[in-house]
A protein has these predicted regions:
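C-terminal single-pass membrane-anchor helix
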Residues: 7-15
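Interfacial alpha-helical end/capping and short helix-turn segments at domain and membrane boundaries
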Residues: 72-158
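Glycine-rich, aromatic-bearing surface loops/beta-hairpins
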Residues: 140-201
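Charge-rich, acidic-biased intrinsically disordered regions
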Residues: 66-69, 90-104, 169-181
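Generic structural signal of hydrophobic/aromatic residues within well-ordered alpha-helices
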Residues: 25, 29, 64, 82, ...
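N-terminal topogenic membrane-targeting module
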Residues: 19-90
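Short acidic, glycine/proline-enriched loop segments that cap or flank alpha-helices
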Residues: 36, 55-56, 135-142, 161-164
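Feature marks short, highly hydrophobic, charge-poor N-terminal signal-anchor/signal peptide-like helices
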Residues: 1-7
């Protein structure tokens, strides 16, 4: 009986510690995101891409693409500023566990199994910028698909930091009906390489 009581209270303790740590992470990232309109701009972009891609008449889609350019530029600037601003945070607070589920204090107890969110945000900012420059000379339709994937992967990373990799992947599927592997395959080769080098190291 004593064993079951100990196990019960231990489970409660772990859950409470995990919840407290996740709240701290949400508050930390939220305090930086609130300076920008990233979420609003990202929704506008993805909705705009869908509208433009749904038009079969180039004359009707052209104004939509044109209107999206200023939003794309804003997202590029905000991602770069977010990555720069977060570098002022003490390193231990930005560590992210590679484990699929959240474990309290994993960033302190198992630092070798973590990566730095600050570095990851640099990868996302660079990836969006590179895709927007369109060095690969993709047609606008294909570029929009790639930019959408870059944004979805950025969202996944934010949820991974705040919750866990498993929760982030579930939210990606629930919100966009798109799997993590699909998104990873759709970003630029440079983003995919730099991303995997960091999160799988």
């Amino acid at each position: 009986m004593d064993f079951f009581f100990l196990a019960f209270f231990a489970t409660i303790g772990v859950y409470a510690a995990k919840t407290a740590e996740q709240r701290q992470r949400i508050a930390l990232l939220g305090s930086y995101l609130q300076k920008f309109q990233l979420e609003k701009h990202m929704e506008q972009l993805i909705d705009g891409y869908l509208r433009a891609l749904g038009e079969n008449d180039p004359q009707r889609s052209a104004p939509i693409w044109s209107n999206l350019e200023s939003i794309e530029a804003a997202v590029r600037e905000e991602l770069a500023r977010l990555a720069d601003d977060l570098h002022e945070v003490w390193g231990e607070r930005t560590r992210v566990s590679r484990w699929p589920v959240a474990v309290p204090f994993a960033n302190r107890l198992f630092p070798a199994s973590t990566f730095d969110l600050r570095t990851l945000l640099k990868v996302h900012a660079k990836g969006f910028d590179t895709s927007l420059r369109n060095d690969d000379q993709l047609v606008r339709r294909d570029q929009a698909f790639r930019l959408t994937a870059e944004l979805m992967l950025f969202q996944h990373s934010c949820h991974w930091f705040c919750r866990s990799r498993t929760v982030a992947s579930a939210r990606l599927m629930a919100r966009h009906k798109t799997g993590y592997d699909q998104v990873l395959a759709a970003v630029s080769p440079e983003t995919r390489r730099d991303y995997l080098d960091l999160v799988q190291a």
